[in-house]
Amino acid sequence: MAMETCFRAWALHAPAGSKDRLLVGNLVLPSKRALAPLSVGRVATRRPRHVCQSKNAVDEVVVADEKNWDGLVMACETPVLVEFWAPWCGPCRMIAPVIDELAKDYAGKITCCKVNTDDSPNVASTYGIRSIPTVLIFKGGEKKESVIGAVPKSTLTTLIDKYIGSS
């Protein structure tokens, strides 16, 4: 269905005589009759429109380090959840999918970052990180709370809800 819609939009907005070709592999496309519900005169007067739009909000975990820390965390207007982790840490691998889900669930409301403590030891030592995984919540460039260990998603959602509800 999505491919059919995108192809229909391409067919409507492709310039007449265009040498561009749509490569579709072995996909079966709808008939020409199904693609041309509008008259030629009407197609020519239509303004192009966007068929697909991406979300403006970041819905994935962003990697923070010593170079981008101030811009990503300290200057962020929305609350920021920061996970301190290391690749060799078993509990860190357990909580990583939870942090990924939270980034998607709260896209536009919070920013989720992760800091590899092996790659950015100065950031970790600045905030007294001695155990991983550790999750810190920042709001207005200020550390508000911390959670140590691989905790359930419900613990983190309760914490996040506390900070996205207040200004």
UniProtKB/Swiss-Prot annotation:
InterPro entries (UniProt xref): Thioredoxin, Thioredoxin-like_sf, Thioredoxin_CS, Thioredoxin_domain
GO MF term set: protein-disulfide reductase activity
Disulfide bond annotation, renumbered to this chain: 89-92
Transit peptide, from-to: 1-53
UniProt domain Thioredoxin: residue ranges: 54-165
Subcellular location: Plastid, Chloroplast
Pfam families: Thioredoxin (PF00085)
Swiss-Prot/TrEMBL keywords: Chloroplast, Disulfide bond, Electron transport, Plastid, Redox-active center, Transit peptide, Transport
CC per GO annotation: chloroplast; cytoplasm
Main location: plastid
Family according to the record: Belongs to the thioredoxin family. Plant M-type subfamily.
Subunit structure: Forms a complex with heterodimeric ferredoxin-thioredoxin reductase (FTR) and ferredoxin.
Function text: Participates in various redox reactions through the reversible oxidation of the active center dithiol to a disulfide. The M form is known to activate NADP-malate dehydrogenase.
PANTHER family in the cross-refs: GEO12009P1, THIOREDOXIN M5, CHLOROPLASTIC
Official protein name in the record: Thioredoxin M-type, chloroplastic
